[in-house]
UniProtKB/Swiss-Prot annotation:
This is Methylthioribose-1-phosphate isomerase. It catalyses: 5-(methylsulfanyl)-alpha-D-ribose 1-phosphate = 5-(methylsulfanyl)-D-ribulose 1-phosphate. It comes from Dehalococcoides mccartyi (strain ATCC BAA-2266 / KCTC 15142 / 195). Catalyzes the interconversion of methylthioribose-1-phosphate (MTR-1-P) into methylthioribulose-1-phosphate (MTRu-1-P). GO terms for molecular function: S-methyl-5-thioribose-1-phosphate isomerase activity. Belongs to the eIF-2B alpha/beta/delta subunits family. MtnA subfamily. Its EC number is 5.3.1.23. GO terms for biological process: L-methionine salvage from methylthioadenosine. Keywords: Amino-acid biosynthesis, Isomerase, Methionine biosynthesis. The active site is at D233. Gene3D superfamilies: translation initiation factor eif-2b, domain 1, Translation initiation factor eif-2b, domain 2. It comes from the Bacteria. The record marks C153 as: Transition state stabilizer. Substrate binds at R44, G45, A46, R87, Q192, N243, K244.
């Protein structure tokens, strides 16, 4: 399954909201459709969101029918702003938009700018693919033979437009013959673990067990989990990390049980412009994601609901970051 493909100036995405029941690809021909796909999680995962955003901006630019820079620029800015407004937490989205904006700012010929925008989007895609491969290789070195690794949400090929980050580490360790196994949390409320990670683990041939989010502490207490590896949506300058809601709880549990807690993420997820996790904007999603499952109501009507999509794990709970440039370990004093 390919999460994202650029073909003949069209963006082809796998609709991840339908998995694992249906494998359906969507052909997106304009940037509005790309923005909607990002908002509705048809494409998801920080690296994949960044790649889709770049292609969406390129599509929007290709659709601007003028050869005059003075007319092109304000229309382009509308495109970029709409794509950037889709989801507030993932750093990769804003990184992609900034790079595309830089291409426009440095150009003088509209036709060439459009070509350069497509080239930049393809470059971003290739960079994320290569980064995920390197992350997986570095991370696999941390996994010992026979270990059982727990992962949360989905940070595999579907989420990264490439090989995977957290799940890529597990897949790489398996391919090295380390005889490992995995636990995958179902990841409420949208069940990315049950729907997507379980599917990718099954396809990779890795022995695993699917558990509810609240079971993780039980299995840590039983001593059957040797490491936790998760992805990230944004990492602050001090190492505080925003990831899928529930990640912080897992980090606290891992510390309490002496289990290493690793964050696997490309450099595009690191945001040096913010000092700490206090500055990370946490996306609040619609209450129906909690009160309904696939359109079926599971909670009483007219109740208050809180639905933050992410939480922030303080840097002092993270054993190390796994990046395409190597392993970044937490210093003893910081």
């Amino acid at each position: 399954m390919k999460a994202i493909e650029w073909r003949d100036n069209r963006l082809i995405i796998l609709d991840q909201t339908l998995l694992p029941l249906e494998e359906k690809y969507l052909e997106l021909n304009d940037y509005h459709a790309v923005a909607e796909a990002i908002k509705t999680l048809r494409v998801r995962g920080a690296p994949s969101i960044g790649v889709a955003a770049a292609y969406g901006i390129a599509l929007g630019a290709l659709g601007i029918e003028t050869q005059y820079c003075s007319e092109f620029l304000p229309l382009y800015q509308q495109v970029s702003a709409e794509i950037a407004s889709t989801r507030p937490t993932a750093k990769n989205l804003f990184m992609a938009a900034e790079r595309m904006d830089h291409v426009v700012a440095s150009g003088t010929d509209v036709s060439q700018v459009k070509i350069s925008l497509v080239e930049e989007a393809v470059k971003i895609h290739h960079e994320e693919e290569e980064a995920s491969r390197k992350i997986s290789a570095f991370g696999a070195e941390l996994i010992q033979p026979g270990w059982t690794v727990l992962t949360h949400c989905n940070a595999g090929p579907l989420a990264t437009a490439g090989y995977g980050t957290a799940l890529g580490v597990i897949i790489a360790a398996h391919q090295q013959g380390k005889n490992i196994s995995a636990f995958a949390t179902e990841t409420r409320p949208l069940l990315q673990g049950a729907r997507l990670t379980a599917l990718e683990l099954k396809e990779a041939g890795i022995p695993f067990k699917l558990i509810t989010d609240s079971m993780a502490g039980h299995f840590m207490q039983k001593g059957v989990i040797n490491a936790v590896v998760v992805g990230a949506d944004r990492i602050a300058k001090n190492g505080d990390t925003a990831n899928k809601i529930g990640t912080y709880s897992l980090a606290v549990l891992a510390l309490a049980h002496g289990i290493p807690f690793y964050v696997a993420a490309p450099s595009s997820t690191f945001d040096k412009s913010i000092e700490s996790g206090r500055d990370i904007v946490i996306e609040e999603r619609k209450p129906e994601e909690i009160t309904q499952i696939r359109g079926q109501r599971i909670a009483p009507e007219n109740i208050a609901v809180a639905n933050p999509a992410f939480d922030v794990t303080p840097a002092n709970l993270i054993t190390a970051f796994i990046t395409e440039n190597g392993i970044i370990r937490r210093e003893a004093k910081n």
